[in-house]
């Protein structure tokens, strides 16, 4: 018997509860997590029995099992801090759980974590895992009734001319608190609210994670309702804030099935690829994300961890002192995670990150090119597959060019430490010292298949279009 085992003792209650532990969750850490919980529950009459009942009879109704909420909402176990409901769901149900965004409370739960009550329920059977929504296929007309006289190319040119020389800026959470009047027309029968910006946005104070696999973030908004295609109304394109009076006549959705080709969404092997730039120079190879939880940081990791894109490893002979200084401040960088058809960005760096996402801007009613500042410790949803699916379904009725325009929505740009836009002396992202471009493979491949079915544009795309 070694010295460690002489001084270690696991109580019978902890041993019993560990009997229901799932998968390969780190043994010692799980034991400490359960031990910490037992100490809290022993102070409450019947709490231990209720937890054991829930774990032993998962199909049966059970009551809330609560512990006091800490000041920051997190629970420290050994050297790691995490959200309590996520920790115990990870121990007893889903060892591969990545973040709180993957959990939703059941209706029977009286003390869900998101309710911010003095007590928080840690009963793992009072939470369910968020599943990726099934996106409806896009119905592409076989015979387009789109009138080439109503070319949208001129409107695209006008839109580009009317856009500000520099993007607008917004700071999270300040610019996100008040509902924004939505500049994009919505389908009359859309299941989305009239003002997406009025929904509760992500909580502003999300503590930084220790690693991409740790469940240590504060909650964000829940996924929006599934898109219900309109049955008898004309849909309007919402991909850009164009003059709807000039829109080409759409194709009525209520058309014969034989006249359309259904194009379904397919989840790709790599949900995104990330390319790193310094000023206008691409540096290194693209990083292909197979894990749904990715860290992009300024450190070096020679182990080639598939969950980390370490910018500290990349060299550039043209690097100047400004770039060198900026790279030193990237630090823990950004945590990107893809869950339930949504992409979130959490700033782990001590310095802010700056994101340009047309999908996020659409949701909040901002100008398409707005750059959003995400301060340290904050988390923001930067892409929503369901909203993209709605826009794509509407856009096919307005022709090839409108659908093609959505490719801009599938590329996200993000700079570290230094921002750009109207409030900064850097006008363009290529003027920032360190930035990344994120290509979302699923939406891009879906667009590609839809465009293939639509054939060629009425006006050939050229260098001036």
Swiss-Prot record:
UniProt GO MF annotations: co-SMAD binding; DEAD/H-box RNA helicase binding; DNA-binding transcription activator activity, RNA polymerase II-specific; I-SMAD binding; identical protein binding; metal ion binding; primary miRNA binding; protein kinase binding
Write out the entry's keywords from A to Z: Cytoplasm, DNA-binding, Metal-binding, Nucleus, Phosphoprotein, Transcription, Transcription regulation, Ubl conjugation, Zinc
In this chain the MH2 domain maps to 271-465
Where Phosphoserine occurs, the residues are 463, 465
Single GO biological process annotation from the record? bone development
Keyword Magnesium among UniProt keywords:
no
Composition skew (Low complexity), residue ranges: 179-210
Origin superkingdom: Eukaryota
Chain spans, region Disordered: 161-240
Disulfide bonds, which pairs?
A: none
SMART domains documented for this protein: DWA, DWB
**What processing steps or modifications follow its translation?**
Phosphorylation of the C-terminal SVS motif by BMP type 1 receptor kinase activates SMAD1 by promoting dissociation from the receptor and trimerization with SMAD4. Phosphorylation by ERK2 MAP kinase in response to EGF or HGF prevents SMAD1 nuclear accumulation and transcriptional activity in response to BMP. Dephosphorylation, probably by PPM1A, induces its export from the nucleus to the cytoplasm. Dephosphorylation is inhibited by association with EGR1.
Binding of Zn(2+) occurs at 64, 109, 121, 126
Residues forming the MH1 domain are 12-136
Q: Name one GO cellular component term.
A: heteromeric SMAD protein complex
Checking InterPro entries in the record gives: Dwarfin, MAD_homology1_Dwarfin-type, MAD_homology_MH1, SMAD-like_dom_sf, SMAD_dom_Dwarfin-type, SMAD_FHA_dom_sf, SMAD_MH1_sf
Task: Give compartment(s).
Answer: Cytoplasm; Nucleus
Q: Which Gene3D superfamilies match?
A: 2.60.200.10, SMAD MH1 domain (3.90.520.10)
Its quaternary structure? Found in a complex with SMAD4 and YY1. Interacts with HGS, NANOG and ZCCHC12. Upon C-terminus phosphorylation: forms trimers with another SMAD1 and the co-SMAD SMAD4. Interacts with PEBP2-alpha subunit, CREB-binding protein (CBP), p300, SMURF1, SMURF2, USP15 and HOXC8. Associates with ZNF423 or ZNF521 in response to BMP2 leading to activate transcription of BMP target genes. Interacts with SKOR1. Interacts (via MH2 domain) with LEMD3. Binding to LEMD3 results in at least a partial reduction of receptor-mediated phosphorylation.
Hey, which family's this protein in? Belongs to the dwarfin/SMAD family.
* PANTHER family in the record: MOTHERS AGAINST DECAPENTAPLEGIC HOMOLOG 1 (PTHR13703:SF23), SMAD (PTHR13703)
**Job description of the protein:** Transcriptional modulator that plays a role in various cellular processes, including embryonic development, cell differentiation, and tissue homeostasis. Upon BMP ligand binding to their receptors at the cell surface, is phosphorylated by activated type I BMP receptors (BMPRIs) and associates with SMAD4 to form an heteromeric complex which translocates into the nucleus acting as transcription factor. In turn, the hetero-trimeric complex recognizes cis-regulatory elements containing Smad Binding Elements (SBEs) to modulate the outcome of the signaling network.
Q: What is this protein called?
A: Mothers against decapentaplegic homolog 1
The gene that this protein is the product of is: SMAD1
């Amino acid at each position: 018997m070694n010295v460690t085992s002489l001084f270690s003792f696991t109580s019978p209650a902890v041993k019993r509860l560990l009997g229901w532990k799932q998968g390969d969750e780190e043994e010692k850490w799980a034991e400490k997590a359960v031990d910490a919980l037992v100490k809290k529950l022993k102070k409450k009459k019947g709490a231990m029995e209720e937890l054991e009942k829930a774990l032993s009879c998962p199909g049966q109704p059970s009551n809330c099992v609560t512990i006091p909420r800490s000041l920051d909402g997190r629970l420290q176990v050994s050297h790691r801090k995490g959200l309590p409901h996520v920790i115990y769901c990870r121990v007893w149900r889903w060892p591969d759980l990545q973040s709180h965004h993957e959990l939703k409370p059941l209706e029977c739960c009286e003390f869900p974590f998101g309710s911010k009550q003095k007590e928080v329920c840690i009963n793992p059977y009072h939470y369910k895992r968020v599943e990726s929504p099934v996106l409806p296929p896009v119905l592409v007309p076989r015979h387009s009734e789109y009138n080439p006289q109503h070319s949208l190319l001129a409107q695209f040119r006008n839109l580009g001319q009317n856009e500000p020389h520099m993007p607008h800026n917004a700071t999270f959470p300040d610019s996100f608190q008040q509902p924004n009047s939505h500049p994009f027309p919505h389908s009359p029968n859309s299941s989305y609210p009239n003002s997406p910006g009025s929904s509760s946005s992500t909580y502003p104070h999300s503590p930084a994670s220790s690693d991409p696999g740790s469940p240590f973030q504060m909650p964000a908004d829940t996924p929006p309702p599934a898109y219900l295609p309109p049955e008898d109304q004309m849909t309007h394109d919402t991909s850009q804030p164009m003059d709807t009076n000039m829109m080409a006549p759409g194709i009525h959705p209520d058309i014969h099935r034989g006249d359309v080709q259904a194009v379904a969404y397919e989840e790709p092997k790599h949900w995104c690829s990330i390319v790193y730039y310094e000023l206008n120079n691409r540096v290194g190879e693209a990083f292909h994300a197979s894990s749904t939880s990715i860290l992009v940081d300024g450190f070096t990791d020679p182990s080639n961890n598939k969950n980390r894109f370490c910018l500290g490893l990349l060299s550039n002979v043209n690097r100047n002192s400004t770039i060198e200084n900026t790279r030193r401040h990237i630090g823990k960088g950004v945590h990107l995670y893809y869950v339930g058809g949504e992409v979130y960005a959490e700033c782990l760096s001590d310095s802010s990150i700056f994101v340009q996402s047309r999908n996020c801007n659409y949701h909040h009613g901002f100008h398409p090119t707005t750059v959003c500042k995400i301060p340290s410790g904050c988390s923001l949803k930067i892409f929503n597959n369901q909203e993209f699916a709605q826009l794509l379904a509407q856009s096919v009725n307005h022709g090839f060019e409108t659908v093609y325009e959505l490719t801009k929505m599938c590329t996200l740009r993000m700079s570290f430490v230094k921002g750009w836009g109207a409030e900064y002396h850097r006008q363009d992202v290529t003027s920032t010292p360190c930035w990344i471009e994120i290509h979302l493979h699923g939406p891009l491949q879906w667009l590609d298949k839809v465009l293939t079915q639509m054939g060629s544009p009425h006006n050939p795309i050229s260098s001036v279009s």
